[in-house]
Amino acid sequence: MHPKVQSLLSKFPRVELIPWETPIQYLPNISKLVGADIYVKRDDLTGLGIGGNKIRKLEYLLGDAIIRKADVIITVGAVHSNHAFVTGLAAKKLGFDVVLVLRGKEELRGNYLLDKIMGIETRVYEAKDSFELMKYAEEVAKELEEKGRKPYIIPVGGASPVGTLGYVRASGEIAEQGNRIGVNFDSIVVATGSGGTLAGLSVGLAILRKETRAIGMAVGKFGETMVNKVEELAKATGEFIGVKNLKLKIELYDYSFGEYGKITREVAETIRLVGTKEGVILDPVYTGKAFYGLLDLAKKGELGEKILFIHTGGISGTFHYGDKILSFL
C-alpha cells in the first residue's frame, strides 16, 4: 500500500474482507493482438464469495455500519446483481441481518440462486430503475426502525464517498505493484455502472499525482448525466477524505451497446477470445463489454503503450445469460 494513500485513509473505519493483494497479470497473447502491453488487475480474486470490485467498497461501507451500530444491512440492485449478493454474504459473515431490495424477473439462476442458497432475505419489486428501488429500500428501513432495528442502507453498487474509498485504496495498491514490476501504466480501464470504482481510481491517481488516465467503459445508460455523476462522486470523495483542489482526470466511453445487460455478438466473442487466449473469464454485463472497449481503443492507439484492465468480477452473471451468449457463438 502506498504510504500517502494509507495515511489519508487511516482515519476511516475499515473491516478487512480481502486478506491479500490481488495480482497484476500480463496478457501476452492479447498484447500481440492489439500492439500494446495489456495487464489485468485480478479483482475477481478478492476472496469473498464470487470476488469482485464490490468487496473493496464493502470493507469501508460495513466498517462504517459497525461504527454506527447498525444491525441490519439493506442494499439494492437487479435480481442478478453481483453487488447485492456479495453485500449479503459479507454482511452475514460479519453478523448482520440483511435485506436485498431487488428488481427484475425472479429466476433461480446466477446470483439470485446464490442469494436463496445462502438464506439471504430478498424482496423483489417492480421498479424501472435503481432510483425507484432506493425509495423501496427507504420504506424497508422505516419498517425495520419501527420494530426497533438499526438499518444501514448501501446504495446501488456501493457508490458513495464511503464506498469509493475502496478504490482510492486500490490505486495505492496498484501504484506499489507497478513500482515492483517496473511498469508505469498509461491508462487504467474499468467497467463503469454506478461509477464508484472509476471515481475512486481517479481520486487515488490524483492524490498520487499520477499521469495515468482513469478510463471508464460505460456498460449501461450513457450520457452527460452519467459523466457528471462520476465527476460529482469523485469530487465528493475528495472532500470526504479532506483533500482539496484535486486535478481529476476522468474519461468515460460508451460501450453499453444501448442498455445495461444487453448481450451482443461482440461481447460474446470477447469473452471467448480472452478466455481462450489468456485463461481469464469475463462476464457479459460488465467486464466483457469493458474489455471489448479496451480492445477497440487500444487497436487505435488511444490508450497508450501500457494498459491495465481491472477485472471487476461477475462470473456468476455468465450463468444467468448463458443462452444469450451461446446464441452468438
Swiss-Prot record:
EC supergroup of this enzyme: hydrolase
Reactions that this protein is recorded to catalyse: 1-aminocyclopropane-1-carboxylate + H2O = 2-oxobutanoate + NH4(+)
InterPro entries linked to this entry: ACCD_DCysDesulf (IPR027278), D-Cys_desShydrase (IPR005966), TrpB-like_PALP (IPR001926), TrpB-like_PALP_sf (IPR036052)
Essential cofactor(s): pyridoxal 5'-phosphate
Keyword annotations of the record: Hydrolase, Pyridoxal phosphate
Annotated S-S bridges: none
The UniProt record lists the keyword Hydrolase: yes
Residues found modified as N6-(pyridoxal phosphate)lysine: K54
Domain of life: Archaea
Any Pfam family hit: PALP
Enzyme Commission code(s) on record: 3.5.99.7
GO molecular function: 1-aminocyclopropane-1-carboxylate deaminase activity; D-cysteine desulfhydrase activity
Family: Belongs to the ACC deaminase/D-cysteine desulfhydrase family.
NCBIfam families: ACC_deam_rel, PRK14045.1
Annotated protein name in UniProt: Putative 1-aminocyclopropane-1-carboxylate deaminase
Naturally occurring in which organism (per UniProt): Pyrococcus furiosus (strain ATCC 43587 / DSM 3638 / JCM 8422 / Vc1)
